[in-house]
């Protein structure tokens, strides 16, 4: 048997491993910044004093995302997109949350409303519907991010009641209801996305319960 065949295969394996290592290093740097922003946004309705920190973190994440996009665009998208897929979902989710809570430019979207996929791409300066298979924000990443936002809004509904911000649960419920009804028109082919959507009914119920309790106790 000609061993050169396996030597060539090993060379290709080493090459692909090197590419994955480079991409993973960029993703790790991005993830580190995402953790910082997530902490800043965790109770953003109760703490409006960290606006400058949030804006700075958003800009850093934007820069890191564009850096990853530039690097990743040198390689076949569908071969390596699994390296950054979850991290980019989180980028989109945190930008949706920042916008919903009024931490982004309100000329893009008013507070308590949802950025579109195209708007997120415009903010990050990353392609959304590319003609070629290069780095971009995918529809699936956006939909996962929207569902994650709903889970966070349901969680923050409870926290906002504790802190006396009684209007937040109503805004959150309005958004979750709209997302729930909008997802009904989609024919989801992605198994992961279908499972994620299945959990939305629990977020909706949780949010409805908070609003019901507020009304029953005449707090609004």
Curated annotation (Swiss-Prot):
This is Translin-1. Belongs to the translin family. The gene is tsn1. Transmembrane segments: none annotated. GO terms for molecular function: GU repeat RNA binding; microsatellite binding; single-stranded telomeric DNA binding. The keyword RNA-binding applies. It comes from the Eukaryota. GO terms for cellular component: cytoplasm; cytosol; nucleus. The keyword Transmembrane helix does not apply.
């Amino acid at each position: 048997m000609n061993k050169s065949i396996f030597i060539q295969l090993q060379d290709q394996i080493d090459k692909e491993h090197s590419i994955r290592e480079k991409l993973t290093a960029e993703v790790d740097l991005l993830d580190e910044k995402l953790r910082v922003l997530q902490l800043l946004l965790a109770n953003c309705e109760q703490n409006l004093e960290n606006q400058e920190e949030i804006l700075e973190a958003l800009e850093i994440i934007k820069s890191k995302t564009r850096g990853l996009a530039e690097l990743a665009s040198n390689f076949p998208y569908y071969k390596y997109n699994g390296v950054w897929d979850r991290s980019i979902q989180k980028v989109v989710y945190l930008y949706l949350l920042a916008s919903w809570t009024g931490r982004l430019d309100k000329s893009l979207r008013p507070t308590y409303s949802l950025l579109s996929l195209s708007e997120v791409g415009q903010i990050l300066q990353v392609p959304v519907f590319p003609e070629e298979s290069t780095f971009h924000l995918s529809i699936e990443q956006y939909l996962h991010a929207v569902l994650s936002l709903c889970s966070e809004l349901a969680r923050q509904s409870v926290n906002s009641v504790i802190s006396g911000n009684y209007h937040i649960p109503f805004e959150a419920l309005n958004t979750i209801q709209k997302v729930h009804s909008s997802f009904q028109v989609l024919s989801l082919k992605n198994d992961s996305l279908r499972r994620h959507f299945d959990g939305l009914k629990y977020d909706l119920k949780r949010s409805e319960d908070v609003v019901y309790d507020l009304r029953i106790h005449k707090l609004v």
